[in-house]
Amino acid sequence: MSLLTLIAGVAVGVTVVPRIVARRQRRAAYAAGMTVSQMLQHITSLSPMGVAVVDTFNDVVYSNDRAVELNVVRDRILDDRAWQAAQRVFETGQDVEVDLSPLKVANPGRSGISVRGKVRLLTDDDRRFAVVYIDDQSEHARMEATRRDFVANVSHELKTPVGAMSVLAEALLASADDPDTVRRFAEKMVAESHRLADMIGELIELSRLQGAERLPDLDAVDVDSIVSEAVSRHKVAADNSQISITTDAPTGYRVLGDEGLLVTAIANLVSNAIAYSPNGTDVSISRRKRGGNIEIAVTDRGIGIAKDDQERVFERFFRVDKARSRATGGTGLGLAIVKHVAANHNGSIRLWSQPGTGSTFTLSIPEYPDPESHSDEREDQRER
C-alpha cells in the first residue's frame, strides 16, 4: 500500500508540478510587465519625433511611424538628403544637421511645413549604423514668420506717425512768428500723438490677449450694458460723420465673459463700421440667441469687403482701404483684437460682406448659464 501511495504521489508530482511552475512563470511575467526591449520600442513608436536607423548600404533597419509620416522614410529607403548626411556621419563620425522640409516648399516658415533632421552614429565604436532624428518644427517656423512680419509691420506703422510728428515739429519751429500756422501744426501734432498712443495701447492689449498673461475670471455680463457702452464711446465720431447708430430693443441677455474685453470688442466693431461708412448712412446693432450662444451683430452700409480680403481682415495691420483708414486714424489692429477676444471667450467672430452694399460682423459668445432657468426646465420635465 505504501508503495502504491509513493507511486501515485510521484505521478501527481510529475503532472502537477510543471503546471504550477508554468503558472508561477506566467504570473511573474504578468507582474513584471513588458520587457525593456518592448518598452523602448513602444516609446519610440509613440514619439512625436521621427526616428530611423540606417546602415552603410542605405537600408533602413528600423523606423517609427512618425518618420514615415514626415516622408523621410519611404519603402525602407531614406530621403536622399538624410542619406547624404548619414554618409558624412559614417565618414567623419561627427553629427550632421540637415533640412528635410519638402523640396517644393520655397519658404517653409510661410507654408507651414518645416522639418529638421539630426544624424549621428548609433554607437561611437561601431560605424555600421546611424540614427536619424526627425523633428517637425512647422509650428515654430510659423511663429517665427509671424513674429518677423509683426516686427516689420510695427516698425512701418510706428514710423509713419513718428515721422509726421518730426516734420510737424520742424515746421512749427520755422513758423514761430505766425500764430495761426503754429496752431494748425500743433493741432496736427496732437492728432498724430493720439494716433501713436492709440496704436501703442492696442499693441499692448493685443499682446496681452495673445500672451501668457492670465485673463480675468469670466463672470455674468449684461449684453445690453456692453452694447450701450460701446455705442457711447463712438457717439461723437458718428455724429461728426452724420452717421446714425441704431440698436434693437434691450433683451436682458447675459453672457459668460469679461465686461471690459467685450466692450472693447464691440466698440472696435462699431468704430470700424463708422470708419468705412459714407456720411449720412446708418450703423445698426442687433442681438439674438442662437443655440447656447448670444450673437451681437454690427452692420454698416459702407464700401463692403471683397471676397479675397475677407479672410485677411482679422490680420494685424491689414486694411481694406489704407487711405481711408489713415484718414480716420485707424491702427489696423481693431479686428485682430476682436478675433482674440472672441477666442478667449470660447466664442467666434464671422463676417458677411458684399462690395458696395456693406458688411455685418457677428460676435458670438456663450450664454451665461442661468440656474433658475435650468431648474424650471427640470420642473417642467418632472410634470410631464
Curated annotation (Swiss-Prot):
Gene Ontology terms for molecular function: ATP binding; phosphoprotein phosphatase activity; phosphorelay sensor kinase activity
KO phenotype (gene knockout): Deletion mutant does not exhibit detectable PhoA activity, even under growth conditions where Pi is the limiting nutrient. SenX3-regX3 deletion mutant is more sensitive to phosphate limitation, showing a reduced ability to grow at lower phosphate concentrations. The M.tuberculosis operon can functionally complement the growth phenotype in M.smegmatis under phosphate-replete conditions, but not under low phosphate conditions.
Membrane topology: Peripheral membrane protein
Region of interest (Disordered), ranges: 360-384
Domain of life: Bacteria
Compartments reported by the entry: Cell membrane
CDD domains: HisKA (cd00082)
Keywords, comma-separated and alphabetical: ATP-binding, Cell membrane, Kinase, Membrane, Nucleotide-binding, Phosphoprotein, Stress response, Transferase, Two-component regulatory system
Reaction equation(s) it catalyzes: ATP + protein L-histidine = ADP + protein N-phospho-L-histidine
Signal peptide: none
Listed EC numbers: 2.7.13.3
Positions of post-translational Phosphohistidine modification: H156
SUPFAM superfamilies named in the record: ATPase domain of HSP90 chaperone/DNA topoisomerase II/histidine kinase (SSF55874), Homodimeric domain of signal transducing histidine kinase (SSF47384)
CC terms in the record's Gene Ontology section: plasma membrane
Biological role: Member of the two-component regulatory system SenX3/RegX3 involved in stress response. The system is involved in phosphate starvation response. Probably exhibits a dual role as a phosphatase or a phosphodonor for the response regulator RegX3, depending upon phosphate availability. When environmental phosphate is abundant, SenX3 is required to maintain RegX3 in an unphosphorylated state, where it is unable to bind target DNA. Under conditions of phosphate limitation, SenX3 autophosphorylates and then transfers the phosphate group to RegX3.
Protein name: Sensor-like histidine kinase SenX3
The organism of origin for this protein: Mycolicibacterium smegmatis (strain ATCC 700084 / mc(2)155) (Mycobacterium smegmatis)
Source taxonomy: Bacteria, Bacillati, Actinomycetota, Actinomycetes, Mycobacteriales
